[in-house]
Amino acid sequence: TQAVAEHLMVGETAITQGMRDAVANASAGAVFFHWPLEFPRVFHRGGFDVVLSNPPWERVKLQEQEFFAVHDAGIAAAATKAIRGGLIKGLADSNPALLQAFEEAKHDAEASSQFLRTSGRYAKTGVGDVNTYAVFAGLGRSLTSPRGRAGIIVPTGIATDNTYREFFAEVTETGALASLYDFENREKLFEAVDSRYKFSLLTLCGEKQEEVQFAFFLTQPSQLSDK
């Protein structure tokens, strides 16, 4: 817990074998990844020269219907949230293992959301109804060296949604934004994405850019070469 961590840092609590085991188990389950520890030479030089990312576009908050669509179609298809809630409670008798799996998934999602909101690493992207695409946009920027660039495929909401206004204002005002190419999916560049959905090729850089390139309402990458 946070309280235990604070006591450990000031030497008021001894590290027990039980604590070591708990940390090892948590690490195995959460699959912790620390970029500077994994790539010490890269970060000794300031970061990556090139970062390319096509991150997931998903809400961190657990979606009940999505979870049960995989595990129990009947619950997923419930007509209302209230009915679905009753069916979930009923799992305590009919399928306690599934209920436990649901509660664990819900806890993991809430813990992830809490970390993204409060850790300080994602101050401008781990906000609102936290979405992974914004988190990855912020991460891509933080991994990039002063001379490097990060290219990320994200929903255009990174630039237009009120939730991320502080992030986009920061990359614009500091000169970290190199380009934003906005696409509509009317020609189904992404088959699984709704045709009305808008996404962008976002390029961020370490060095301050004097000029920024923008394009909007594109439908094909070939249009980027149009003058």
Where does each model-flagged region fall?
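Conserved helicase NTPase catalytic core signature
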Residues: 1-40
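Signature of N6-adenine DNA methyltransferases within the class I
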Residues: 33-227
